[in-house]
Design a protein with these regions (language model features):
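Coil-to-beta-strand transition motifs
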Residues: 16-18, 30-32, 143-147, 154-162, ...
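Acidic (Asp/Glu-rich), glycine- and aromatic
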Residues: 146, 158-198
Length: 240
């Protein structure tokens, strides 16, 4: 269901349960991405026709970055959910988005059935090395660091994400870190990282960070909470 610029999706998990998704402009920078993922009780054969309803179980909520930000030495983070130097100025903006159902463009407010829903979002990441003062004396970023294209493909209980960046900065910029993926699974208690540092279930409080250089075969990050599991998979192409 597309309604007022928001996109609501429901899909069957089993005969008693649906998964629901809510896409909208969100995070501090108002980028179009998935805002909420949850589970709804539904014993009918078809997915719920009210995917906008509050889910019985919240799986993901966008309280941080679900689109990778860049860390620029001396300038902090830009993109995703980040403010310039974590103060008040935005570090990215939405240039627009396209919604498709089975490859056909969704126009206006509508409700329909589909096997695959695709969201194509276009964002601009602003250059934090070139801040300005606006008329009110506040900080503002205006120059483009890169143009970010993100495609979300939703099938049943899976969101496949591909992102690309076309850099058009006016002067050289050093990127120290790029977070290609971040999970915001609610209430996680244990993690498992096959090929990584945690090859058995490990309590979240006892888990720490590790690098891809240390564990080059690592690609899957599995989380567990009291309701179920979530698995995040890095694709083998480019940086994942």
């Amino acid at each position: 269901r597309s309604q007022g610029g928001d996109l609501y999706i429901s899909a069957k998990l089993d005969e008693r349960t649906d998964i629901t998704y809510w896409f909208r402009r969100c995070m501090f920078n108002e980028l179009y991405t998935f805002y909420r993922v949850g589970i709804t009780r539904n014993r009918t054969a078809l997915p719920t026709t009210q995917p906008e309803a509050e889910p019985a179980v919240l799986l993901n909520s966008t309280y941080s970055d679900n689109i990778g930000p860049f860390a620029i030495p001396g300038c902090g983070w830009c993109g995703g959910n980040h403010k310039y130097r974590e103060r008040t100025a935005r570090t990215a903006r939405s240039e627009g988005y396209t919604l498709l159902a089975d490859g056909n463009r969704i126009e206006g407010d509508t409700t329909l059935w589909a096997n695959r829903v695709t969201v194509e979002a276009e964002n601009v990441i602003l250059d934090p090395t070139r801040p300005y003062r606006n008329a009110a004396g506040g900080e503002e970023l205006r120059d483009t660091l890169c143009r970010e294209s993100v495609t979300y493909t939703v099938r049943r209980n899976n969101i496949e994400v591909t992102a690309s960046h076309r850099f058009c900065n006016a002067a050289p910029v050093t990127i120290a870190i790029y977070y290609g993926m971040q999970s915001m699974f609610e209430g996680e208690t244990h993690v498992l990282t096959p090929g990584g540092a945690y090859t058995d279930w490990t309590e979240v409080a006892k888990a720490s960070t590790f690098t891809k250089q240390e564990h080059p075969l690592f690609r899957r990050y599995v989380e567990k909470n009291r309701q179920g599991y979530q698995s995040t998979w890095l694709l083998p192409d480019e940086i994942g």
